[in-house]
Amino acid sequence: MVIQKNWQELIKPNKLQVSAGDDPKRVATVVAEPLERGFGTTLGNSLRRVLLSSLQGAAVTSVQIDGVLHEFSSIPGVREDVTDIVLNIKTIAIRSQTDQPKRMTLRKTGPGLVTAGDIGAVGDIQILNPDLVICTLDDGAEIRMEFTVATGKGYVPADRNRPEDAPIGLIPVDALFSPVTKVSYRVETTREGQDLDKDKLTMTVETNGAVSPEDALAYAARIIQDQLQVFVNFEEPRKEEAAPLAPQLPFNPALLKKVDELELSVRSANCLKNDNIVYIGDLIQKSEGEMLRTPNFGRKSLNEIKEVLAGMGLHLGMDVPGWPPENIEDLAKRFEEHY
């Protein structure tokens, strides 16, 4: 028996459709089809669990409030008690560019609302919901807080966020590090050719904005892939490689490389795929204006692609004589060793 048939003959999704919600940075629906019967539930459930439990994120882990010794206190001139303030602090959405704990401060004088946007800026930290109300100050009231922000995964209860040498007045906070706030999936029947019993997996992912839904799904898939690798206890037999003479081409053989090998971000790669840009030779003939007219393709993706192409000595808007060549897939395989 040829062992490769165990996985090579299974149907794999040939379509991955991404539909952004009202806020593309926070909500998206991804459809994968066709899948072998039963794989929709297997993959959907696994991805959902990993999305909710295993992605790294940032959260407030403790807070100190001037004049407050514990969370059951009240603050003169502040309408909310400390317990309510701590509950509001738990919902601050944060993006952190560092693994190290950081301190952030807030100071404000009333009257008025105190919001997450009043927290002093720190270079590596970004508040994603600045309009979140933390508390309300009466006229003449003043409040000063100091927050500790850390990175982690999953849910960590407050008692585990209290340092052994915690000073008096430090209030630990329940930390929900996961940037993914909600995941749902459904499995429907679809067809592949004459087969009517294949699965169609639809996943809706919501995040707090620290990571896009598309990237969150990609990270979750990578985690599952990495965890399963230990179970693969064999090496696949190598195919015998033929060594035909490579024909002379009127262009750089590197243009035969596929764009999905460029290690682009998930968003950039999906935009190229949706625009039927398969090879680097297809890509470099596009102008910047043409790329920016591609749906969901923005300036950030454009700069990323320009930087990658520059590293190869290429740029957008190039004229490539003889492109596309005949039998391009065959040529790409024959020139793999050359790029």
From Swiss-Prot:
Region (Alpha N-terminal domain (alpha-NTD)): 1-235
Domain free text: The N-terminal domain is essential for RNAP assembly and basal transcription, whereas the C-terminal domain is involved in interaction with transcriptional regulators and with upstream promoter elements.
Superkingdom of origin organism: Bacteria
Name of the protein this chain belongs to: DNA-directed RNA polymerase subunit alpha
Catalysed transformations (reactions): RNA(n) + a ribonucleoside 5'-triphosphate = RNA(n+1) + diphosphate
UniProt keyword list: DNA-directed RNA polymerase, Nucleotidyltransferase, Transcription, Transferase
Alpha C-terminal domain (alpha-CTD), as annotated region: 251-339
UniProt entry tagged with the keyword Nucleotidyltransferase: yes
Biological processes per GO annotation: DNA-templated transcription
Enzyme class per UniProt: transferase
Subunit and interaction comment: Homodimer. The RNAP catalytic core consists of 2 alpha, 1 beta, 1 beta' and 1 omega subunit. When a sigma factor is associated with the core the holoenzyme is formed, which can initiate transcription.
InterPro entries according to UniProt: DNA-dir_RNA_pol_insert, DNA-dir_RNA_pol_RpoA/D/Rpb3, DNA-dir_RpoA, RBP11-like, RNAP_asu_C, RNApol_insert_sf
EC number: 2.7.7.6
Gene Ontology cellular component annotations, sorted alphabetically: cytoplasm; DNA-directed RNA polymerase complex
Name of the encoding gene: rpoA
Entry similarity comment: Belongs to the RNA polymerase alpha chain family.
Task of the protein: DNA-dependent RNA polymerase catalyzes the transcription of DNA into RNA using the four ribonucleoside triphosphates as substrates.
One Gene Ontology term of the molecular function aspect: DNA binding
Gene3D superfamilies in the record: 5' to 3' exonuclease, C-terminal subdomain, DNA-directed RNA polymerase, insert domain, RNA polymerase, RBP11-like subunit
